[in-house]
Amino acid sequence: MGACDIVTEANISSDIDSNATGVTAFSMPGWQLALWATAYLALVLVAVVGNATVIWIILAHRRMRTVTNYFIVNLALADLCMATFNAAFNFVYASHNIWYFGRAFCYFQNLFPITAMFVSIYSMTAIAADRYMAIVHPFQPRLSGPGTKAVIAGIWLVALALAFPQCFYSTITMDQGATKCVVAWPEDSGGKMLLLYHLTVIALIYFLPLVVMFVAYSVIGFKLWRRTVPGHQTHGANLRHLRAKKKFVKTMVLVVVTFAVCWLPYHLYFLLGHFQDDIYCRKFIQQVYLVLFWLAMSSTMYNPIIYCCLNHRFRSGFRLAFRCCPWVTPTEEDKLELTHTPSLSVRVNRCHTKETLFLVGDVAPSEAANGQAGGPQDGGAYDF
């Protein structure tokens, strides 16, 4: 690829053609730059405030500290960091075609975005796996608190390892007086290495986890909506519990679909560049990239909105978090939603070969956090 790398994001750059002397000037009118800056600023603010609030709601209230919610915290943290460190700085780079932030941040910028995206989608995958075990195999041992922390740490370590090659080959170059942050793959096989690496990354951080989640939620949906136990009718607390499960699954499916839709055009854009690399030299491509990059980064701000709209506890949490706003009036019920722990009752269902626990309310936070074995014991997680 030549020097036309303006809209290849810093962390997805190509090899350097040291003999290239021409450079494509990408500029836009001031009013257009102001509109883009406003759009990206709004995105960052909504994502940072929303995800920070989600983290506070879960960590500050003992009732919310379930295994599933710890994965949601991990997802929110990754999205918050993605919006803060990737959206803002890469917008500046893409809109000016000059790297202002130094060599150290160039390394970081080629390491962190892939890391954060991997953490985001595999946190969603972990939630799908946890729900699969709870609903499809309710009597199998569940993740404990230490086990959950180990999974989260493992996700971050694998993500860093996957992103390391780009960081390793990162460098700062000068192109006719303009500073660029690029990834300089080895000259003898740079094009092949770049394509292979991008295909591997896209497969691991997009297609593979989406397939896993599709299968998991399909089986869960079949279990909840199709499967019935002969002679057993769901009513009362059990019916509420079943409805909570269904609502949780719908919420997480919406989160996954939103992520997939936001990121697909962005991945296709870079795959297209491998087979038609002169497209990056065309004037219109800057605007195309800014649209696709905004769409991809916007995935970081939708989850808090989805939680608030579809889950009453998160809605109560948001009202408490923004109670200083004159148009927000939290109630005592909002406080109880996040602090009160309903009682637990037990009875035996003779339709099964094993004794089954049925919840009147939610499981105690300590039990949920410790991931006690048995499906019904994670009842609180279905309601977040």
Curated annotation (Swiss-Prot):
Lipid positions (S-palmitoyl cysteine): C324
UniProt membrane topology term: Multi-pass membrane protein
One GO cellular component term: plasma membrane
Topology Cytoplasmic: residue spans: 57-69, 130-149, 219-251, 311-384
GO molecular function: substance K receptor activity
InterPro entries (alphabetical): GPCR_Rhodpsn, GPCR_Rhodpsn_7TM, Neurokn_rcpt, NK2_rcpt
Keyword S-adenosyl-L-methionine found: no
Glycosylation sites recorded in the entry for this protein: N11, N19
Protein's UniProt keywords contain Metal-binding: no
Domain of life of the native organism: Eukaryota
Keywords, sorted A to Z: Cell membrane, Disulfide bond, G-protein coupled receptor, Glycoprotein, Lipoprotein, Membrane, Palmitate, Receptor, Transducer, Transmembrane, Transmembrane helix
Bilayer-crossing regions: 33-56, 70-90, 108-129, 150-170, 197-218, 252-272, 291-310
Disulfide bonding pattern of the chain: C106-C181
Localisation: Cell membrane
Family matches, as SMART domains: 7TM_GPCR_Srsx
Extracellular-side segments: 1-32, 91-107, 171-196, 273-290
The family this protein is said to belong to: Belongs to the G-protein coupled receptor 1 family.
PANTHER family recorded: G-PROTEIN COUPLED RECEPTOR TKR-1-RELATED (PTHR46925), SUBSTANCE-K RECEPTOR (PTHR46925:SF3)
Functional description taken from the UniProt entry: This is a receptor for the tachykinin neuropeptide substance K (neurokinin A). It is associated with G proteins that activate a phosphatidylinositol-calcium second messenger system.
Protein name: Substance-K receptor
